[in-house]
UniProtKB/Swiss-Prot annotation:
One of its GO terms (cellular component) is Ndc80 complex. This is Kinetochore protein Nuf2-B. Its main location: nucleus. It holds the Pfam family Nuf2. Residues 143-462 form a coiled coil. Gene3D superfamilies: Ncd80 complex, Nuf2 subunit. Keywords: Cell cycle, Cell division, Centromere, Chromosome, Coiled coil, Kinetochore, Mitosis, Nucleus.
Length: 462
């Protein structure tokens, strides 16, 4: 007792635990601290051990009252009153080593002591707590395995749906493949032709505009020079008028010459203004051509926008493919985890199979003993009737649990039907979405054909 692997619990805690988890009905109500410590009652201790063994080893109450036939007793019916205690001693010798108690003696059941009883019950209490926690861990493990299987199924389903979407997005219908190829080649050719014509006309217009600007600058320079010469000549004329007295004939001839020069200057000015108007008309014509070129540019921009949409669709397809690859990786990892879980479950199943084989063997031996004992134990029929009443109560509880199970199955079936209806509605909505998408693609193809025809008409006019 000095080298314990579990704590010694007080009697009050042990009483509360066994009331809540082991004993039921009047047994739990009548069970108190004085039954265990300081002077334990053998009847209550034996009854408590019997209930613990029933829960741990799944023993029936009637099995404790059967005398084993392998004992060398001349009159086994004489020791039937000692049969429950003998079975308790045999099963306690199996149970207590699992509870880390290796010094069990029959006197612990026949003549229990206070501290010794607390020691044994503390070991059993520790084992039962460990058993319940491990059972919860195992149930969580089973639920996690089921959820992992559900995730694998969902990922496989999403993988399949993503593959179908990728096939629908990447594949062009066979009746539209030739038209799609022809339209793409025509669009490419039109882009090249329009870009070449635009570059050539743009270069030509830029050269003409630069040439006209140079001519305008030169004409303006000459006009300014002539204006400057006229102003200087007027100033000189005024200055000379004040200094020289000219004859009327000279003045007349000089004025005539000046009128001629003014007339020539007016003619030159008129010619320059006419040339300016002509150049202005040419520039306006160039601006008109520029508007047409801008229209072509807008059409090119629309084509680029369509190509950008096509590129985005390809990017979306690539993104879906990446998601599909990630889902495949997750599926592989989950399949590996599934394989590991299956291997662990197989090992546990093998262990359970071995235990089942042992239990079957023991059951066969027990059945054989039971057949031999039935002839001897007819006088304990009255005790069995009481036990049968309790068994009937247990069967009634089992029937109630079965009915609850059927109700749960009905609710799950209803939920399954609702899920099936949701899936059908989702499929119908998806088909409508695909139909609308197909109609939109047909409308875009019609618009593209109309734009190509309009471009061809404009090109043929030019």
């Amino acid at each position: 007792m000095d080298k314990l692997t579990f704590p010694i619990f007080p009697a009050a805690d042990l009483v509360n635990f066994f009331r809540q988890n082991i004993l039921t009905g009047t047994e739990a109500k009548n069970f108190n601290k004085n039954d265990l410590y300081p002077n334990p009652k053998p009847e209550m201790v034996q009854k408590l051990y019997m209930r613990i063994l029933q829960q741990v080893f799944s023993y029936g109450v009637e099995q404790f009252y059967m005398v084993p036939m392998d004992l060398d007793i001349q009159y086994p019916h004489l020791v039937e009153g000692f049969a429950p205690v003998a079975n308790i001693l045999k099963l306690m010798a199996r149970l207590l080593p699992m509870c880390r108690v290796y010094d069990f003696h029959p006197s612990d059941v026949l003549n229990p002591k206070g501290k010794r009883t607390l020691h044994l019950l503390s070991g059993i209490f520790n084992f039962l707590q460990f058993r319940t926690t491990q059972r919860e861990v195992y149930m969580e493990y089973c639920s996690g395995y089921k959820s992992a299987l559900e995730n694998v199924r969902q990922l496989q389903k999403t993988n399949h749906e993503a593959e179908i979407k990728i096939e629908k997005l990447t594949t062009v219908p066979p009746e539209q493949q030739a038209e799609f190829k022809a339209l793409s080649s025509e669009i490419h050719d039109l882009q090249q032709i329009i870009s070449q014509e635009y570059r050539a006309k743009d270069v030509m217009f830029q050269e003409k505009i630069a040439q006209r600007k140079a001519e305008f600058a030169e004409k303006n320079k000459r006009l300014n020079e002539q204006k400057l010469t006229i102003a200087t000549m007027k100033e000189e004329q005024e200055r000379m008028k004040s200094q020289i007295v000219e004859s009327p004939e000279q003045r007349k001839s000089k004025t005539e010459r000046m009128k001629e020069t003014v007339h020539r200057l007016k003619q030159a000015r008129q010619e320059t203004s006419d040339k300016c108007d002509h150049y202005r008309d040419r520039v306006a014509l160039a601006f008109m051509w520029q508007s047409d070129v801008q229209g072509y540019l807008k059409k090119l921009q629309n084509i680029d926008a369509n190509l950008e949409i096509h590129r985005k669709i390809h990017e979306e397809i690539r993104h879906i493919e990446e998601q599909l690859m990630n889902l495949n990786l997750e599926l592989k990892s989950l399949s590996n985890e599934d394989a590991q879980l299956k291997r662990i479950i197989l090992v546990k199943k093998e262990k359970l199979a071995k235990v089942d084989i042992k239990n079957k063997k023991k059951q066969e031996d027990f059945n054989q003993q039971k057949q031999e004992i039935l002839e001897v134990c007819s006088h304990i029929q009255e005790k069995r009737q009481v036990i049968h009443g309790r068994v009937a109560q247990v069967l009634q509880e089992i029937q109630q649990t079965i009915s609850k199970k059927e109700q749960l199955l009905e609710t799950t079936e209803a939920g399954k039907n609702k899920c099936q209806e949701v899936i059908t509605d989702f499929r119908a909505a998806l088909e409508k979405y695909h139909d609308s998408l197909q109609k939109a693609s047909e409308r875009s193809a019609d618009r593209r054909r109309e734009k190509i025809a309009e471009l061809n008409r404009r090109l043929s006019r030019q």
